[in-house]
Amino acid sequence: MNIWTNLAAYSLIETQRLYLRPFLFEDAEDFYKIASNPENLHFIFPAQADLAETQYVLANYFIKNPLGVWAICDKETNRMIGSIKFEKLDEIKSEAELGYFLRKDFWGKGLMTEAVKELVNLSFEKFQLKELKIVTHVENIGSQKVALKAGFRLFRQFKGSDRYTRKMRDYYDFRLGRGDFYE
């Protein structure tokens, strides 16, 4: 089996407090609650002006190519509260970059760390990846804590162009290799 077959087999994932599942168009209102608040996505993309814009983003960037993209749902309410996805997946090198966001009122509860740890485990055990990385803005302390708690190590700091503002920014590159995972 290749990576895509394995990802298809794990389109639904359950953790202690979360469901990870493919996005649905019905998630648009929950997605809008996240995307319309600039505090939720300060480091991801600009706040969205209205539900129609959110529906466009949801359909074109989260639903259109569903493999390796999960809606994070709270088990208690079954509401979509965030996303976790392989931003960049290199099938040849067997490596991927994880990207994620979570609604602000769910921050600080260990939920994103729980989701990342589950994907780390699946990435090395089932998807046969050799390395994972997480890239954060230097100012994004919350995402850095998630990366470290999930076992990633700081690999380097670098400058890069922000994909939305086109301004040069400082980033941290965290890495976790298959060998590090099994230590």
Where do the model's predicted regions map?
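Acyl-donor (CoA/ACP) binding surface of acyl/acetyltransferases
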Residues: M1-H42, V69-E183
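Conserved GNAT-fold acetyl-CoA-binding loop/helix
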Residues: E39-A59
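A short helix-loop-beta-strand connector motif used in the catalytic cores of GNAT acetyltransferases and
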Residues: A59-A71
